[in-house]
Amino acid sequence: NNTYFSHKGNEPGHHTVMGKTYKQDPSKKLLSLCKDLARDPKTSLHIAKRLAQHFVADDPPREAIELISHAYNRSGGTLAVVHQAVIDAVVKFSREDDKFLQPEIWLFQVHKAIQGELPLKFVGDTDDHNGPQLNSILSELGHLNCRSPQPNGWSDMAIDWLTPEMMDRRLRYIGQISNRKMRESGFDPKKYADMLFGAGSNSAQFVASAPTYRNACIRLFCHPKFMRT
């Protein structure tokens, strides 16, 4: 028990939460309340829905939520069991292109594709591979982890990321690094498009028909199929 409990700030007396009255010692009441909330069926459903929305689909099927919720209840919330249930739900119920990539994951996917180090400044000419520059890019992309909105954190919904402003930020970032970073790495957007979309497909031809190297990179990395998983 690593909980610190301040008796000075505690409101004395009995406390009733969700129809149950807690009469124990103040610090024990807190632990008892937390355990009851964790065991409540509504808690497992809430957690299961949020996990399914993050990994399966913005509007996940009821079966996916129930699979995760059942694992939570059966194991008492054991993380390893719940995580395995999430994987099973993804395998069984997710479809290709169901989830839109948040900026952070999209950024990592871009640099994984070009096999390049992370990353250049979002604005500027100097190479700098330390943490602050990565934070600068994530901030410009609108997804700096330490600035997540409260109380719900970053949204898992595509509608919150698919806005003109947020798309413009991604376009500008690809436009910047394509001029030097991608060329230096020997990255070929047309070959990558053939591998990702299928040689001869409409999407691959769309990338191949780009008038410039920069434009080809933008068409590839800002293509709907690249930005979804």
Regions picked out by a protein language model, each given a short descriptive name:
Residues 80:
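Conserved active-site loop region of the serine DD-peptidase/beta-lactamase
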